[in-house]
Design a protein with these regions (language model features):
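Short beta-strand element of the alpha/beta-hydrolase
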Residues: 38-48
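The serine-hydrolase catalytic nucleophile loop
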Residues: 49-62, 76, 265
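Alpha/beta-hydrolase active-site loop
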Residues: 56, 89-110
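Alpha/beta-hydrolase-fold enzymes
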Residues: 130-211
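Short beta-strand/loop motif that positions the catalytic acidic residue
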Residues: 246-247, 253-255
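Catalytic histidine-centered segment of alpha/beta-hydrolase-like enzymes
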Residues: 285-298
Length: 317
């Protein structure tokens, strides 16, 4: 259902009502010629770890809008143009709550149907979208791209080969960082993406470095780091917790055939209680290719747009 004209955008501040006191910076992507006198489905697009709305989340939101869907990309609390201290906090529970906070705002828009809300995300934003759907039944359909369950990422490594117990040292590192913070010694930083190409442990992590630290995808609001104290919140986190019971919404889980972290997409599919769930594999693509590279992105968008249009087609779906 492509539109003939480019979508329009509107930057909005979202005052959260969740007790954390942050203001989320968001951009609403509207299909060209949207009838604001009627109500429409909307999709909340969550950024990757340390990513901002001007990067891959914004790219997907824009393309979904070009395919007729209202889409909202945003900066996580404590990151980008959103407020909150300490800066670059990556607390997975708050990242998940951000999605529900954006939904609180989106359903107040006169042209959005409260009962036709979808969620999608890229990398750990996909994991957070899954977790939000487990917690928040207002989400009626979920799409994921290059899934990352941030707890798995940090505990078990890129390919899932590291035992949980072997991540205990990172809990200790996070605890030490909190001691430093409490003592006024400053907030220690921890890389979310390799700081240098030579720090990468595989080809996909080289691509991750390239995306966040070169003109390919870099943005001044996305330094590719987080607070080290975040480790105490990440290591024990599971984005798929209770998916076997509460993740009942329709799911479309997309990964590249060459994605070394594809096991997390497969796990989400296997654990979900949903009876309407599908895997879509993009031939030849790795994890980072689905952030921005063509023809992969347009292939993914075509799948997502069709999925959301169908699953969010009826009020009260």
């Amino acid at each position: 259902m492509p539109q003939s004209k480019s979508p329009t955008t509107e930057a909005v501040p979202i005052e959260t009502r969740n007790g954390y006191g942050t203001t989320i910076a968001a951009v609403i992507h509207l299909p060209a010629g949207l009838d604001t006198g009627a109500t429409h489905p909307a999709v909340v697009v969550s950024p990757s770890g340390g990513g901002v709305k001007e990067q891959t989340a914004g790219l997907y939101a824009s393309k979904l809008a070009a395919n007729g869907l209202v889409a909202v990309a945003y900066d996580a609390s404590f990151q980008g143009e959103s407020t909150g201290m300490p800066r670059q906090l990556e607390n997975p529970h708050l990242r998940t709550e951000d999605i529900s906070a954006v939904i609180d705002f989106v359903i107040s828009l006169p042209y959005v149907d409260t009962h036709r809300i979808g969620a999608m995300g890229i990398c750990v934003g996909a994991g957070y979208s899954i977790n939000a759907a487990i917690n928040d039944p207002r989400i009626k359909a979920v799409g994921t791209v290059s899934m990352g369950n941030i707890g798995h990422n940090f505990r078990n490594g890129w390919d899932g080969s590291v035992a949980d117990a072997d991540a205990a040292h990172m809990l200790a590192q996070g605890a030490t960082a909190r001691i430093r913070d409490a003592s006024g010694e400053g907030s220690e930083r921890y890389p979310l993406a390799p700081r240098r190409k030579q720090d990468a442990q595989n080809r996909e992590q080289e691509d991750e470095w390239e995306y966040y630290h070169t003109p390919r995808g870099q943005h001044p609001n996305a330094p590719g780091i987080m607070t080290a104290r975040s480790l105490t919140q990440i290591i024990t986190y599971d984005a798929f917790h209770k998916a076997e019971v509460y993740l009942t919404q329709p799911l479309l889980l997309i990964s590249g055939s060459e994605d070394g972290a594809r096991w997390m997409t497969d796990e989400a599919h296997d654990r979900a209680a949903s009876r309407d769930k599908a895997l879509y594999v993009v031939d030849g693509a790795n994890h980072m290719d689905l952030y921005d590279r063509q023809p992969y992105v347009d292939d993914v968008v075509s799948q997502l747009a069709s999925f959301f249009a169908d699953r969010l087609s009826r009020s009260g779906a």
